[in-house]
Amino acid sequence: RDVLGSRGLGDVYKRQNLTSLGIQDNNPDIGIMIERDGYVFAGLSQMVGGWTSPENYKQADVAVIDTKTDKLVKMISEKTSGFSQATRPIDPKSLFMDEKGDIYISCLGNFGMVAGHKAGILRIKKGETDFDPTYHWTITGASIEGEEKVAGFAASICYAANGKAYGYIDIPGYYKPGETGHGAIASRAVVFDLYNQKMKKIEGLDLSNGYGVLVSKYKDGLAIANASTTTKGIYYLNPQTDKINPIPMITTIGNPMAIEWFGN
């Protein structure tokens, strides 16, 4: 319910009470945050009574906090696209900034579990504290180059450079009866072209379940998890070619749920 403000790396200095931003339960469900130009932008999931927001709450919310005054400036809301749930709390890279200083926010759309809600990506441009009205990329129902079925929501996303990000798209077309996006073997690894709003299938990885899908920068490339019906492990991805090394760097018994490389 609270969010910690930060003035630079490691300098946590005051607790912000954001309960007033929550709907119905005084808990806005703070997700991923980023600091830019003296402001912290915090995605809000707005979950009520479970893992989803209410059916009639079709908007994406972000709290804006001034790090100089330690005060909440405002909550910004995007209400025209039908997006909901700004950022995925278990994916630290679902809110990120490109080289231009523009912030991108991945919205989950209630994991496709609530009718009428959509997943997509929003932007807050450099120097602004409001959503960019010219940018809203709808992921739900979008086509993926090299994939016959349409997208559901972005299960994970990791920004690399030059408008390209990598991650997984949950595809409801692969669900078996009674399955949801977490347990189903239905997540496809893709390249996100943020500037042109396009997705492309990454060859060499099978469909994964919804747990082994996270991606991290790794040395000069990326480490990408995968939990398919045959193998669970972490693979190396070359962002220059978008190619996967077919031999996993590490194999795991359980789902490789989180990855973070500590290096230069």
Protein language model regions, located:
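Surface-exposed loop and turn segments in beta-propeller and other repeat-based domains
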Residues: 14-26, 72-90, 130-152, 202-208, ...
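Conserved beta-propeller blade signature
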Residues: 39-41, 102-104, 166, 222-225
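Short, conserved, GDST-rich strand-edge loop motifs in beta-rich repeat architectures
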Residues: 42-59, 105-120, 167-184
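Loop-centered beta-sheet repeat module
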Residues: 55-119
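Loop/turn-rich, solvent-exposed surfaces of beta-rich toroidal or solenoidal domains
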Residues: 149-226
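Beta-propeller blade signature
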Residues: 6-7, 55-70, 117-129, 182-195, ...
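Single conserved hydrophobic/aromatic residue that forms the stacking wall/gate
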Residues: 2-13
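Structural signature of eukaryotic scaffold interfaces centered on beta-propeller domains
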Residues: 27-36, 91-100, 150-162, 213-218, ...
